[in-house]
């Protein structure tokens, strides 16, 4: 396993200053590929036994990937036999051919045991093979939600990762230099389970986070030099009215304290409702998300005004599906006269002027470069930087 340098001397430097950080954040937001889980979609459709966890702390199953055809349930159980607390295993097979799909699940007696196995085995060599374990939680976010109550942390983006880099390898690379590292996450493709070439490292100490951004930039993790950058934070700072001073007055919806609906224009034809939920959901609780069939626009309604303002301020002008999206205030569906935009009526012919409620704002909202630097508490909320 590749070890990090004994010291960070000679590491590549990144420019300092808030302007540079903001530019890097803009790059992050231009690739809105939110990963609420690092395992293939199939893992969310399968639960060992009758498990139906009500919360992340109830999840006691792990996803295991990169399985070869000969790796069956007996092999998986034997691998984890020394833990003494694996209760069952399942390899997912093609219904027509009976061949392994390359992944499966292991259930343990408790969440704490599963978590210990994940931390111990992930990235370690698999017995009788020349490959390493690829493990993750069997439910999206199961290993992330608990971090939200552990106090503040500070996160960096790590790009240009080699395909073989695992959570363990990435974490170990930084832990050998910085004692406050709390964990690392390599983002995987949902369909293939393979690395997307970037990830995140979490620190307990902000000073070490800032040092790592400079000292580790250009250092090697496995076979490639890393590209380090900031990770946008939606929770690190409280909402500040100054953030939105330049978005006020864009249209009537902005002046309505009860309006939490955002119009999303310029959508790529391939963008789905679920993609909008994934992207806009990072800023707060969503009530409704709708893309009219055959239209290049959509609507997102939040549970509160602050979340809507935050999303509008950050996401306006960012890239989604190859297109720059343009945001403005929509009309509140709480008003009976505005129900049509959700029921399939009024929003098919939205007027181009902002005063119509569906049009684009005359000027994109000015974004405060000081408001979003830091790290999300859950890895799933991060975005990839532009390569």
From Swiss-Prot:
The keyword S-adenosyl-L-methionine does not apply. This is Polyadenylate-binding protein RBP45A. It is found in: Nucleus. Residues 329-387 are annotated as: Disordered. Residues 60-140, 154-233, 260-332 form the RRM domain. InterPro entries: Nucleotide-bd_a/b_plait_sf (IPR012677), RBD_domain_sf (IPR035979), RBM42_RBP45_47-like (IPR050825), RRM_dom (IPR000504). Keywords: mRNA processing, Nucleus, Repeat, RNA-binding. CDD domains: RRM1_SECp43_like (cd12344), RRM2_SECp43_like (cd12345), RRM3_NGR1_NAM8_like (cd12346). GO terms for cellular component: nucleus. It comes from Arabidopsis thaliana (Mouse-ear cress). Induction: By ozone-induced oxidative stress. Mostly expressed in seedlings, and, to a lower extent, in leaves, stems, and flowers. Present in immature anther tissues (tapetum cells) and mature pollen grains. PROSITE patterns: RRM. GO terms for biological process: mRNA processing. Its main location: nucleus. Heterogeneous nuclear ribonucleoprotein (hnRNP)-protein binding the poly(A) tail of mRNA and probably involved in some steps of pre-mRNA maturation. Belongs to the polyadenylate-binding RBP45 family. Interacts with the poly(A) tail of mRNA in nucleus. Residues 329-342 have a biased composition (Polar residues). GO terms for molecular function: mRNA binding; poly(A) binding. The keyword Signal does not apply.
């Amino acid at each position: 396993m590749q070890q990090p340098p004994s010291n960070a001397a000679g590491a590549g430097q990144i420019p300092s200053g808030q302007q540079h950080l903001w530019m890097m954040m803009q790059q992050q937001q231009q690739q809105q590929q939110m990963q609420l889980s690092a395992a293939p979609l199939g893992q969310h459709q399968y639960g060992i036994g009758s498990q139906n966890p009500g919360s992340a702390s109830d999840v006691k199953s792990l996803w295991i990937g990169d399985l070869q055809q000969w790796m069956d349930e007996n092999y998986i159980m034997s691998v984890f036999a020394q833990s003494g607390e694996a209760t069952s295993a399942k390899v997912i097979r093609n219904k027509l051919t009976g061949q392994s799909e390359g992944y499966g699940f292991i259930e343990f007696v408790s969440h704490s045991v599963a978590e210990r196995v994940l931390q111990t085995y992930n990235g370690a060599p698999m017995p009788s093979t020349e490959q390493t374990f690829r493990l993750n939680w069997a439910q999206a976010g199961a290993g992330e939600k608990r971090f939200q109550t552990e106090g503040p942390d500070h996160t960096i983006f790590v790009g240009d990762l080699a395909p073989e880099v695992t959570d363990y390898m990435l974490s170990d690379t930084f832990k050998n230099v910085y004692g406050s590292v709390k964990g690392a996450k390599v983002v995987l493709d949902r369909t293939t389970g393979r690395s997307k070439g970037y990830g995140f490292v979490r620190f307990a100490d902000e000073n070490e986070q800032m040092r790592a951004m400079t000292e580790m930039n250009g250092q090697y993790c496995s076979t490639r030099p890393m590209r380090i950058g900031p990770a946008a934070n939606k929770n690190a700072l409280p909402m500040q009215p100054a953030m939105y001073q330049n978005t006020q007055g864009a249209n009537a919806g902005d002046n309505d304290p009860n309006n939490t609906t955002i119009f999303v224009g310029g959508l790529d034809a391939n963008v789905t409702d679920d993609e909008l939920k994934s992207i806009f959901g990072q800023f707060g609780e969503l009530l409704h998300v709708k893309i009219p069939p055959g239209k290049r626009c959509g609507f997102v309604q939040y549970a509160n005004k602050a979340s809507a303002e935050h999303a509008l301020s950050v996401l306006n002008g960012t890239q989604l599906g190859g297109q720059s999206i343009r945001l403005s205030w929509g009309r509140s569906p709480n008003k009976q006269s505005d129900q049509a935009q959700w029921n399939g009526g009024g929003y098919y012919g939205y007027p181009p002027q902002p005063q119509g409620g569906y049009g684009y704002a005359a000027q994109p909202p000015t974004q405060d470069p000081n408001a979003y630097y830091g790290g999300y508490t859950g890895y799933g909320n991060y975005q990839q930087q532009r390569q």
